[in-house]
């Protein structure tokens, strides 16, 4: 009977899928591309081409639907096996017995139609695919003559007879918000004078132009200037003499920031511009980030930009693009099925953005046209020939010399419109430079423009002036539907500016602050969401103590400090020591102030009678359970003081948009503890020792861990009191390689001289074996009972003995990584408990811990890995964690870009070791036809795969010398640094490896996406400080901010309160930012237990929030700059895969 029922279920499922597949093909067969925003791709010409395209498309659909049927068949079989096996509890650990845990959800959660996107992505050919470009380039670096990294450029004198060369000389000043000086010091010494002189000198002549990028500096100057000067700036913007480019808070790094922070600093800058200047930037300007990410191109496109410019790209790629005239291209996302993400990008062709490298290929000549370097000044030309002031006597010869460079540079492009930037770091701070540059160039312009035989039109311009002229020229010569510019997909990492000098060191430099940055992002997002919803309650109940609080001002300051840290010399770890301290102090202060906002907002939301709300300006009612004592110290758990008489209240916030089963761990002062759920029932608790050091157990603190089930964006209240409880269980310990006895106290601690037999821990999904050093050796996935080699080891990289060595920017190793060697077997501590088990290995420079949670669901399916790294006593070394497996990834691996998308990588033997290191923001993985091994990260670091089956992650680097890129120091201010990871091993199904090798795109699984989100957005436990003020103060037992979980593939990026148009307060609107993630379905699905489903990107917003009415919802551009002309109030949103969409939302508490 049971077997018959299983076949009925299976047969019904197959029947439904076949019928659905036929419907899907009929519905879509006449289309070449999916509906929605990606219909813009170019269509084939001619009837035969169209017919062939349709046949190919139907073949793809048949293959995709066969794949769906295969996946569902596997799922039904797995489901029937689960029924056959009966319910499975946790096997627990031998010493602990068993424990009843939540059963997994049904495994089949993804709508089969949502699986089509990943299989189609990358099917559209590009003109330029960066993975292919790497195959084409020899990377041989021959001497190119005056253009050392290029080639000799020639032209014919009559090439401009029919169309003159149009040159835009673009004055600019690159102002780092911190590098060799702090942000404030640079402003005091340089930047304020640049602005002041800009106003004076641009007003002198309407033909003069200037560009500005960093809004952090502009906002600081705006606060101290008078109204006439403000009006002058507005006038300059209005008449086109001044242009704001990009308009973010900073010019961010593009390798290490998460897309959350990239968007946030863009919004902060654009909101400031809208409020104070009423301008909307059109063009992106990124001349100094050390490599470029397509994520930034996508964000600019969705913010409403038409064009962008980049500079720091590998010199061999610049040469290749110059030879093929592909320096200007439409940058298209790898995953785009059409052309909806195209943005016109200009790549500067030469070594640097300074004046010697921007007029043409010969820096010796171009330097002579940087008039700040005239004899008698502080700067000269390193090529030995100084500039000459322009006079009637030399203007002809000097103009000819400069025009020759312009013409040669123009030969690298496809039009006769040329961009010639004129600037450098902190330029135009003195009025004398304005005079020298402007007056000398004005004489050159005047002469050139007055000589028809020169066939040139030259003027000062801005970046948009250039792009406008470029588009006009292209429109004039466009004769067919084919674009003048190629479509390009891929990224521009890893950057090298010369020789084998790859800038892969900064992916890891100062990792302490990279981790602090990610914590800050999670906290600011939590604060934004809680504050917006608490604000609506406060407005409804007229709670003036909340409404009049400085929370919005504090939140704005935190946004700006986070934005400042995305600067390309901040999060990168490439600033002077004291500048790093300044950044760290800003983050630290904002973390503290965010805790107050989170605590006060959560307290109001969880309070039953809102009118009883009180606020102490000096502290929050609800306090975080961790405290960081200084900007460079690790966060520590506070110890909650318990008593038997009065319970302590613990409020746990789930900042994630799905309901969640996760472990909460807190510290208390008593081992006899009872935790009561919101229903008043005791919950299962693991009481673990708090270790003062390797062998000493604290008598003052105990760790209490329990499983909490919290609704999406939900707050839940637990009561904790000192009491004997049958639901409380002590953890057991085994100490290996222990040469001294540990004090047991109340815990059972077993001492072993050495490990002897293998050390093992397990949970319902995984069993792990460790060697006698406490390092992982192999893993068994209980889903299929197969054992997999999975070895963890640590390595050292040194630095080369050549003249140029590793520094803050560069990674220049002395060869392959060398194994970390301990003189004797390290001390190993094994914890086994009801809620979790772990193995901790104590090496001299790393405390390495692998933990398994004994829970069903998402967090039970991966291994948590934490490393406390301390290399403060080493010299010129970099420490790496390597994970080795038998996966045959064939030199192909994958790293994410900005936590947004996955970029395939290849380990290339023709490149040096350091070139094969890439940025990893949230994950890296390797795979073969059967398995995928993913390392998920809670901080940005460098990652690589130096051999088949391996993933390496760089954890810290200590370098004693400068690497000659301007910093003037090494990196030796190392901190004790906590790195946090998860390792996920997944079984793949229905994989075509040949197709996969050709694909320029890849996607995480849904399980991987959610594991990453859990890692980066942990539960936030908060303790009620003291007791409730009076019996009238009652807390709700639970308050879900959402009515139900969002679809599995939709992430609520932020709910950001929008500023008021007047004053410094808030408006009644918020920015709702949603991201629909692309995911891969080719994984065995048994037991995943996702707490959500997918819905083809459709979501009703009217039913989104719990007890908050949506009064209006209007689509907007990403950074709130633009609203569609036909924007209307919406009740349902429909998101395409991979898209990030912003809406203006107005909420009201009901």
UniProtKB/Swiss-Prot annotation:
Annotated residues for binding of Zn(2+): 174, 176, 288, 568
Protein name: Alpha-mannosidase 2
Top-level lineage group: Eukaryota
Similarity comment: family membership: Belongs to the glycosyl hydrolase 38 family.
CDD domains, alphabetized: GH38N_Man2A1
Assembly with partners or alone: Homodimer; disulfide-linked.
Keywords, sorted A to Z: Disulfide bond, Glycoprotein, Glycosidase, Golgi apparatus, Hydrolase, Membrane, Metal-binding, Phosphoprotein, Signal-anchor, Transmembrane, Transmembrane helix, Zinc
Top EC category: hydrolase
Post-translational modifications: Glycosylated.
InterPro entries (alphabetical): Gal_mutarotase_sf_dom, Glyco_hydro/deAcase_b/a-brl, Glyco_hydro_38_C, Glyco_hydro_38_cen, Glyco_hydro_38_cen_sf, Glyco_hydro_38_N, Glyco_hydro_38_N_sf, Glyco_hydro_57/38_cen_sf
Protein EC: 3.2.1.114
Cofactor(s), names only, from the UniProt record: Zn(2+)
Modified residues (Phosphoserine): 80, 82
GO CC field: cis-Golgi network; extracellular space; Golgi apparatus; Golgi medial cisterna; Golgi membrane
Stretches assigned to the Lumenal side: 27-1150
Catalyses which reaction(s): N(4)-{beta-D-GlcNAc-(1->2)-alpha-D-Man-(1->3)-[alpha-D-Man-(1->3)-[alpha-D-Man-(1->6)]-alpha-D-Man-(1->6)]-beta-D-Man-(1->4)-beta-D-GlcNAc-(1->4)-beta-D-GlcNAc}-L-asparaginyl-[protein] + 2 H2O = 2 alpha-D-mannopyranose + an N(4)-{beta-D-GlcNAc-(1->2)-alpha-D-Man-(1->3)-[alpha-D-Man-(1->6)]-beta-D-Man-(1->4)-beta-D-GlcNAc-(1->4)-beta-D-GlcNAc}-L-asparaginyl-[protein]
Species of provenance: Mus musculus
Bilayer-crossing regions: 6-26
Gene: Man2a1
Active site per the UniProt annotation: 288 (nucleophile)
């Amino acid at each position: 009977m049971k077997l018959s029922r299983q076949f009925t279920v299976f047969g019904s499922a197959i029947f439904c899928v076949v019928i659905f597949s036929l419907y899907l093909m009929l519905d879509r067969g006449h289309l070449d591309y999916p509906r929605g925003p990606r219909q813009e791709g170019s269509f084939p010409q001619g009837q035969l081409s169209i017919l062939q395209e349709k046949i190919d498309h139907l073949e793809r659909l048949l293959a995709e639907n066969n794949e769906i049927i295969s996946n569902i068949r596997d799922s039904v079989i797995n489901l029937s096996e689960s029924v056959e096996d009966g319910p499975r509890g946790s096997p627990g650990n031998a010493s602990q017995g068993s424990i009843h845990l939540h059963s997994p959800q049904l495994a089949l959660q993804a709508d089969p139609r949502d699986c089509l996107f990943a299989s189609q992505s990358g099917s559209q050919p590009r003109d330029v695919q960066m993975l292919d470009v790497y195959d084409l380039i020899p990377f041989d670096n021959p001497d190119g003559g005056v253009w050392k990294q290029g080639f000799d450029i020639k032209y014919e004198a009559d090439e401009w007879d029919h169309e003159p060369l149009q040159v835009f000389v673009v004055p600019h000043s690159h102002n780092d918000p911190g590098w060799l000086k702090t942000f404030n010091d640079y402003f005091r010494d340089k930047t304020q004078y640049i602005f002041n002189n800009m106003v004076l000198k641009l007003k002198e002549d309407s033909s003069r132009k200037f560009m500005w990028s960093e809004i952090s500096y502009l906002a600081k100057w705006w606060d101290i200037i008078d109204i006439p000067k403000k009006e002058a700036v507005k006038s300059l913007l209005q008449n086109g003499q001044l242009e704001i480019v990009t308009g973010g808070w900073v010019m961010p790094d593009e390798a290490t920031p998460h897309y959350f922070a990239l968007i946030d600093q863009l919004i902060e800058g654009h909101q400031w511009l809208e409020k104070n200047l009423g301008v909307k930037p059109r063009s992106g300007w990124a001349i100094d980030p050390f490599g470029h990410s397509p994520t930034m191109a996508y964000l600019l496109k969705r913010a409403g930009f038409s064009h962008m410019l980049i500079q720091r790209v590998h010199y061999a790629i610049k040469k290749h693009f110059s030879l093929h005239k592909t320096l200007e291209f439409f940058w298209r996302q790898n995953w785009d099925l059409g052309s909806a993400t195209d943005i016109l990008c200009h790549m500067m062709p030469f070594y640097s953005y300074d004046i010697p490298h921007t007029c043409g290929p010969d820096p010796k000549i171009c330097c002579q046209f940087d008039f700040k370097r005239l004899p008698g000044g502080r700067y000269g030309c390193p090529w030995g020939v100084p500039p000459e002031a322009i006079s009637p006597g030399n203007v002809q010869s000097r103009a000819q010399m400069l025009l020759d460079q312009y013409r040669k540079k123009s030969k690298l492009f496809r039009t006769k419109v040329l961009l010639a930037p004129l600037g450098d770091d902190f330029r135009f701070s003195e009025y004398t430079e304005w005079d020298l540059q402007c007056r000398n160039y004005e004489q050159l312009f005047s002469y050139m423009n007055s000589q028809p035989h020169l066939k040139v039109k030259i003027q000062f311009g801005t970046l948009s002036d250039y792009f406008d002229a470029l588009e006009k020229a292209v429109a004039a010569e466009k004769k067919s539907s084919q674009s003048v510019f190629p479509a390009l997909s891929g990224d521009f990492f890893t950057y090298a500016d010369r020789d084998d000098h790859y800038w892969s060191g900064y992916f890891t430099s100062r990792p302490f602050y990279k981790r602090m940055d990610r914590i800050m992002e999670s906290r600011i997002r939590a604060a934004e969401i809680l504050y917006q919803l608490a604000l609506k309650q406060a407005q409804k109940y007229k709670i003036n103590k909340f409404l009049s609080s400085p929370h919005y001002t504090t939140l704005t300051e935190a946004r700006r400090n986070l934005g400042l840290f995305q600067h390309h010399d901040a999060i990168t770890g490439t600033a002077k020591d004291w500048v790093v301290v300044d950044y760290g102090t800003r983050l630290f202060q904002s973390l503290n102030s965010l805790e107050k906002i989170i605590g006060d907002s959560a307290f109001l939301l969880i309070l039953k009678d809102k009118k009883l709300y009180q606020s102490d300006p000096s502290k929050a009612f609800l306090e975080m359970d961790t405290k960081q004592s200084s900007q460079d110290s690790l966060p520590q758990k506070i110890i909650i003081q318990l008593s038997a008489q009065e319970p302590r209240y613990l409020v746990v916030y789930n900042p994630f948009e799905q309901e969640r089963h996760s472990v909460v761990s807190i510290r208390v002062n008593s081992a006899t503890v009872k935790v009561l759920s919101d229903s008043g029932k005791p919950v299962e608790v693991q009481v673990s020792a708090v270790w003062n050091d390797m062998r000493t157990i604290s008598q003052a603190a105990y760790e209490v861990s329990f499983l909490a089930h919290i609704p999406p964006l939900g707050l839940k209240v637990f009561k904790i009191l000192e009491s004997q409880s049958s639901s409380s269980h002590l953890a057991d310990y085994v100490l290996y390689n222990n040469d001294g006895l540990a004090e047991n106290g109340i815990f059972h601690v077993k001492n072993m001289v050495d490990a002897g037999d293998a050390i093992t821990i397990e949970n319902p999904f995984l069993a792990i074996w460790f060697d006698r050093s406490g390092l992982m050796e192999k893993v068994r996935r209980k889903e299929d009972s197969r054992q997999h080699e999975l070895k963890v080891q640590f390595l050292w990289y040194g630095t080369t003995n050549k003249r140029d060595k590793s520094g803050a920017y560069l990674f220049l190793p002395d060869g392959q990584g060398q194994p970390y060697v301990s003189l004797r077997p390290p001390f190993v501590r094994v914890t086994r408990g009801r809620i979790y088990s772990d193995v901790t290995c104590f090496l001299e420079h790393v405390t390495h811990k692998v933990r398994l949670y004994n829970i069903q669901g998402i967090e039970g399916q991966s291994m948590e890995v934490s490393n406390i790294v301390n290399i403060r006593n080493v010299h010129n070394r970099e420490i790496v964690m390597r994970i080795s497996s038998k996966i045959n990834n064939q030199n192909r691996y994958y790293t994410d870009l900005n936590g947004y998308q996955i970029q395939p990588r290849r380990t290339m033997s023709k490149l040096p070791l350091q070139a094969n290191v890439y940025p990893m923001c949230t994950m890296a993985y390797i795979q073969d036809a059967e398995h995928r091994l993913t390392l998920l990260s809670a901080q940005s670091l460098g990652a690589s795969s130096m051999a088949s089956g391996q993933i390496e992650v760089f954890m810290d680097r200590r370098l004693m010398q400068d690497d000659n890129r301007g910093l003037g120091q090494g990196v030796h201010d190392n901190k004790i640094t906590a790195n946090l990871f998860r390792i996920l091993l997944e079984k793949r199904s229905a994989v075509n490896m040949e197709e996969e090798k050709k694909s320029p795109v890849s996607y995480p699984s849904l399980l991987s996406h959610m594991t990453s989100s859990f890692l980066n957005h942990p539960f936030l436990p908060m303790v009620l400080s003291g007791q409730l003020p009076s019996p009238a103060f009652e807390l709700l037992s639970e308050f879900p901010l959402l009515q139900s979980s969002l679809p599995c593939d939709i992430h609520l990026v932020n709910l950001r309160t929008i500023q008021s148009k007047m004053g410094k307060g808030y408006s009644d609107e918020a920015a709702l930012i949603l991201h629909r993630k692309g995911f891969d379905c080719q994984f065995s699905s048994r037991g995943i237990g996702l707490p959500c489903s997918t819905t083809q990107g459709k979501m009703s917003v009217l039913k989104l929030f719990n007890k908050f009415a949506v009064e209006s919802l209007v689509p907007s551009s990403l950074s709130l700059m633009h609203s569609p002309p036909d924007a209307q109030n919406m009740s349902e949103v429909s998101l395409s895969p991979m898209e990030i969409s912003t809406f203006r939302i107005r909420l009201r508490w009901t």
